[in-house]
Amino acid sequence: MIELILSGEGNSDIGEKDIQLQSFIPGPITVLTINILNYFHKFDIKCHFINRMQLKKYPMTLKGKKKREKIKTTGKGHANLAYKLACIARENNYQVAILMRDASKNEFQSIYQEIMGGFETAMYKNGVAAIPVPESEAWLISCLDPNESKSIEGCKTDMKKLLEQKLLKRNQAHNKETWCEIAGKCAIEKVEAPSFNKYRSDLEKVVKYLF
């Protein structure tokens, strides 16, 4: 079994904690991540979650002026969050840490470098940046209609509205349960969205490292 820790933008992408049961309720991007990992290697996966605000409040643990300066100049906050997530993963012996952030097509490379810079500063090898372009709904649309996936990142239509329209045409509910079902059934090998394929490729590298 491998254990992941994930953090994202909001409750509708990575997931949320059930306050009463104190358990993690996976969102569509977590379900999609499990789907991708199992595409490369079948194994049991346990997911842990920390929301954005909790991660922001988590203390920096690097000591020494030079290391603090290195963290500070790595990025616009994304590097700090990636660093903190890596620290949490290491402290709890989680094998993989995944930080998700939406990005425009022009922002993708800089945000990717910031996140990976944070993981590298923490010397954590299995950190992965999940960066849907322009937002997580684009990946779900790509799973729903793989033929549209190659051009989805250049589409100027609101992704949330587009996903809702596509689900209405299929007489499917526009809710988290449906999104998770789409993610779980996604034909990983058919999706051509560049940001999706980068995520898939990075997860494949992690699988090869672990096994």
Regions found by a protein language model. Give the residues of each.
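Acidic carboxylate-rich catalytic motifs and surrounding loops in phosphoryl-/glycosyl-chemistry enzymes
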Residues: 44-57, 131-134, 177-189
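Structural alpha-beta junctions
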Residues: 31-46, 92, 117-131
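Domain-level signal for Mg2+-assisted phosphodiester chemistry and nucleotide/NA-binding surfaces
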Residues: 1-77
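Charged phosphate-binding loop/patch that engages nucleotide di/tri-phosphates or the phosphate backbone
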Residues: 174-211
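Activity-critical C-terminal alpha-helical subdomain
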Residues: 100-174, 178
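Well-ordered, non-membrane alpha-helical segments in soluble/globular domains
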Residues: 24-32, 74-86, 107-118
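Acidic beta-strand-to-loop metal/phosphate-binding motif
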Residues: 6-8, 93-106
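Generic beta-sheet signal
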Residues: 2-4, 70, 95-99, 127
